[in-house]
């Protein structure tokens, strides 16, 4: 039987692995846990009706968005969504969209 990194049910296979540093409480590696966390986040977003959009901006624009979001006491994501919805509403009222 081959030893899988994700298989932590058979502890005898991992009894002699020496790991540096503090003993960890999570049986999964950091990379595996990050993948699980990302998958869970995507599921939570889907339930909330959210879709992922990737956006690349220059540092100046990001800093301006951060400052504005902080002054309005909201997250940058919420601020961007609000700005987009306002712009779309304005375009709809003009009959463009």
Curated annotation (Swiss-Prot):
GO BP terms in the entry: DNA damage response; regulation of DNA-templated transcription
Induction comment from the UniProt entry of this chain: Expressed at a low level, probably partially repressed by LexA, induced by DNA damage.
Region (Disordered): 1-30
InterPro entries hit by this protein: CopG, Ribbon_hlx_hlx
Composition skew (Basic and acidic residues), residue ranges: 1-20
Pfam entry (one): RHH_1
Superkingdom, taxonomy of origin: Bacteria
Name of the protein this chain belongs to: Uncharacterized protein YbfE
Taxonomic source organism: Escherichia coli (strain K12)
Lineage: Bacteria, Pseudomonadati, Pseudomonadota, Gammaproteobacteria, Enterobacterales
Gene giving rise to this polypeptide: ybfE
């Amino acid at each position: 039987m081959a030893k899988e990194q994700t298989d932590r049910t058979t502890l005898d296979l991992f009894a002699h692995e020496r790991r540096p540093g503090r003993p960890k409480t999570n049986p999964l590696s950091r990379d595996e846990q990050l993948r699980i966390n990302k998958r869970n986040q995507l599921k939570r977003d889907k339930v909330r009706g959210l879709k992922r959009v990737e956006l690349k901006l220059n540092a100046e624009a990001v800093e301006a968005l951060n400052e504005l979001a902080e002054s309005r006491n909201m997250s940058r994501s919420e601020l961007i969504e609000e700005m987009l919805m306002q712009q779309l509403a304005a375009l709809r009222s003009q009959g463009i969209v």
